[in-house]
């Protein structure tokens, strides 16, 4: 049984979050949580929270055994970018893009 959890509009760029997602794809959930705990990146904490949510969803909604679960799929899509202005010298301004992403984790007992 596949169970999904999503974090939409996460305040990290998709490029940075994909680095973390690649570390745990296909792993058992216990091993994935261990990897994320010791990964020194902001995105690791965000991905860990989504993974814990997916595990809880599988346990509560589907009655799955946590020991059998593995990360079947994990992907990070780009969300909308917030546009901000940074003043520069001589009356100019630069545009700053505050990027967001949508993190999706699918756990399965198969």
Curated annotation (Swiss-Prot):
Matching PROSITE patterns: RIBOSOMAL_L22
KW Ribonucleoprotein (keyword) present: yes
Gene Ontology molecular-function annotations: rRNA binding; structural constituent of ribosome
A Pfam family hit: Ribosomal_L22
Ribosomal protein among keywords: yes
Full protein name: Large ribosomal subunit protein uL22
Record key words, sorted: Ribonucleoprotein, Ribosomal protein, RNA-binding, rRNA-binding
Coiled-coil positions: none
Summary of the function given for this chain in its UniProt record: This protein binds specifically to 23S rRNA; its binding is stimulated by other ribosomal proteins, e.g. L4, L17, and L20. It is important during the early stages of 50S assembly. It makes multiple contacts with different domains of the 23S rRNA in the assembled 50S subunit and ribosome. The globular domain of the protein is located near the polypeptide exit tunnel on the outside of the subunit, while an extended beta-hairpin is found that lines the wall of the exit tunnel in the center of the 70S ribosome.
GO biological process: translation
Gene: rplV
Subunit comment: Part of the 50S ribosomal subunit.
UniProt-listed CDD domains: Ribosomal_L22 (cd00336)
Record-linked InterPro entries: Ribosomal_uL22, Ribosomal_uL22_bac/chlpt-type, Ribosomal_uL22_bac/org-type, Ribosomal_uL22_CS, Ribosomal_uL22_sf
């Amino acid at each position: 049984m596949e169970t999904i959890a999503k974090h939409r509009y996460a305040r990290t760029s998709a490029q940075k979050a994909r680095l973390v997602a690649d570390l745990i794809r296909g792993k058992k959930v216990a091993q994935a949580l261990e990897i994320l705990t010791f990964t020194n990146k902001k995105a690791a904490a965000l991905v860990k929270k989504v993974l814990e949510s997916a595990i809880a969803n599988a346990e509560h909604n589907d009655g799955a055994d946590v020991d059998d679960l593995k990360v079947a799929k994990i992907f990070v899509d780009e969300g909308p970018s917030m546009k901000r202005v940074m003043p520069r010298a001589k009356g100019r301004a630069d545009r700053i893009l505050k990027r967001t992403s949508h993190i999706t984790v699918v756990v399965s007992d198969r």
